[in-house]
Amino acid sequence: GLTKPLEETLLNANIKVVVFDGVVPNPTISCIETGLTIFKQQSLEAIIAFGGGSVMDCAKIIGARFVRPNLTVKKMKGLLKIRKKLPLFIAIPTTAGTGSEVTVAAVITDENSHKKFPINDFSLISHYAVLDPTVTLGLPKTVTAWTGLDALVHAVEAYIGKSTTKLTRQRSEEAVKLIAENLLL
């Protein structure tokens, strides 16, 4: 559905399109490895993540695994383990709230231990983020509510964080106000 206009535009520009629609909520290591296999087998040059936070996180680590083939997903856990530029990475979020399209972080689930772990590296920030609010209009109300609460948590975290500044606090207050007005809290 939502990706069709983008796919058609790319195909009309003679750009190869391969859709990986196997991302699961709370992306797993095996999901990433499947995406990586497709990326390599199809000789792709760029990643467009079109979806919510799980799609963004999965795409980031597919790119990271591509540029760091000898580093397993588990070995990427923590801070600054990738330190290599990803292939062109364009993020198009279909939810509002996770902020994953512009963060240094990805959260991955180890399906064997059922534990989540963060991967943080500056290379995980998308090269481009395309923010189109119209793609969020068809979301179920529950998804809008949950991602809105996610945005609220991010705003509060930014306000109370250890590296907060006057500008950060101002923006956090503005974000809380906008979220409250638009989610009818």
Where are these regions (language model features)?
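Short strand->helix junction
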Residues: V24-P25, G97, G138
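Glycine/threonine-rich beta-strand-loop-alpha-helix active-site module
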Residues: S30-L131
